[in-house]
């Protein structure tokens, strides 16, 4: 799909290694921050009840919603590969078109999946449990998940494109602010303080994903990534 010059020197080039670290380190840091945030969220959800119903409902909802996540992750990774090459070739308009198209396809597909799961939730959750109270709770989470997936797939596509372009620290900074302000703080406020429990936590996480998605799109549209390219072809 991509034609590029072969350069044996790149295999042992310290410059190339430094460029890899420049992208890889912020990405690893963002993942670490995300995992720590999820640890806080699970901690708060464990405080919502004594029988672990809210944490269990979250686990069921995540298993079902993972199908939507896979779509967004696949499109984000594929677009990131093409974006890296196009930036190296200075084909910035193609980067814009490709990233926008990947985001649109991802949003449509992920939304279709998540809406289907929300409508068919009562039937799907029966795979895991026959507890009516649990089923009703998971279905509520799947309804909120429609908005969560909308934000997440946008966040994934534009976030990966920014990282590939060399603008790797912006997603980390944005993620650190919104993950802990919206997802973690929102889980405590809505879930525990307001008494919305797992539904409140999901609303907070949906707010986090959508807020970060807006930030990623605005950063991409600013065009600052055009001056941060690391690869030449």
Name each model feature, range by range.
Residues 72-76, 145-164, 170-182, 186, ...:
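Short runs within selected transmembrane alpha-helices of multi-pass transporters and secretion channels
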Residues 27, 31, 39, 43, ...:
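Transmembrane alpha-helix boundary and packing residues in multipass membrane permease domains
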Residues 9-40, 63, 67, 71, ...:
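Hydrophobic faces of transmembrane alpha-helices in multi-pass small-molecule transporters and flippases
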Residues 32-63, 67, 85, 123-132, ...:
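Helix-terminus/linker motif at the lipid-water interface of multi-pass membrane proteins
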Residues 42, 55-121, 152-175:
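Small-residue-rich hydrophobic transmembrane alpha-helices
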Residues 1-25, 83-148, 190-233:
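Short alpha-helical transmembrane segments in multi-pass integral membrane proteins
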Residues 33, 37, 41, 45, ...:
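Alpha-helical membrane-inserting segments
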